[in-house]
Amino acid sequence: MEKTREGEIRRETKETDVFVKIDLDGSGKCSANTGIGFLDHMIQQLSSHGLFDIEVRANGDTHIDDHHTNEDVGIAIGQALSKALGDRVGIKRFGHFLAPLDEALIQVVVDCSGRPHLSFSLDIPSQKVGTYDTELVKEFFGAVVSNGGLTLHIRQLAGNNTHHIIEATFKSFARALRMATEIDPRRSSQIPSSKGVLEQAGQ
């Protein structure tokens, strides 16, 4: 029986209550209800372009601001991703993608190494897109990286529209992550490291 690559996390704090479920071998089905409309839209991009089935439910103190919910959703997504990857046997491990959206062009490179690191180089011109604080984009990816055990490099090669820059980033991340988490048929029973082990973050 083939092992399913799914991760499910329930995270409760005094500030938020977050549930995340991820199936790495899905078809792009998504149900996102975080209370933050723009974040829901970006999670839908992650699901659609990564072909991950993602369910996210969150209740948080958004009457104060979106910071806690945004970060805790990122934490839970990272933890669910790490759980779905397990010991990371057979994955391609590395992924990269260049995604355009009109004038914006974003490059993302990811390594499912178990070693969290974020290099984030976006020049986002506006402080808000709708009601969403754009500084929270970096906070979201930082939370995913730290709890998912990813090395992630994000580079903006072009772009001057805030929405386009952020959406292209999520699309590029989705495609790169899809590539990195796919099973490599040439090493389906091996861990993709000369050390013979990759760390499991977020456990």
Swiss-Prot record:
It holds the Pfam family IGPD. It comes from Prochlorococcus marinus (strain NATL2A). Keywords: Amino-acid biosynthesis, Cytoplasm, Histidine biosynthesis, Lyase. The keyword Amino-acid biosynthesis applies. HAMAP family: HisB. GO terms for cellular component: cytoplasm. Gene3D superfamilies: Imidazole glycerol phosphate dehydratase, domain 1. Disulfide bonds: none annotated. Its EC number is 4.2.1.19. It is found in: Cytoplasm. PANTHER family: IMIDAZOLEGLYCEROL-PHOSPHATE DEHYDRATASE, IMIDAZOLEGLYCEROL-PHOSPHATE DEHYDRATASE HIS7. It comes from the Bacteria. GO terms for biological process: L-histidine biosynthetic process. Residues 184-203 are annotated as: Disordered. One of its GO terms (molecular function) is imidazoleglycerol-phosphate dehydratase activity. PROSITE patterns: IGP_DEHYDRATASE_1, IGP_DEHYDRATASE_2. It catalyses: D-erythro-1-(imidazol-4-yl)glycerol 3-phosphate = 3-(imidazol-4-yl)-2-oxopropyl phosphate + H2O. Pathway: Amino-acid biosynthesis; L-histidine biosynthesis; L-histidine from 5-phospho-alpha-D-ribose 1-diphosphate: step 6/9. SUPFAM superfamilies: Ribosomal protein S5 domain 2-like (SSF54211). Belongs to the imidazoleglycerol-phosphate dehydratase family. This is Imidazoleglycerol-phosphate dehydratase. InterPro entries: IGPD_sf, ImidazoleglycerolP_deHydtase, ImidazoleglycerP_deHydtase_CS, Ribosomal_Su5_D2-typ_SF.
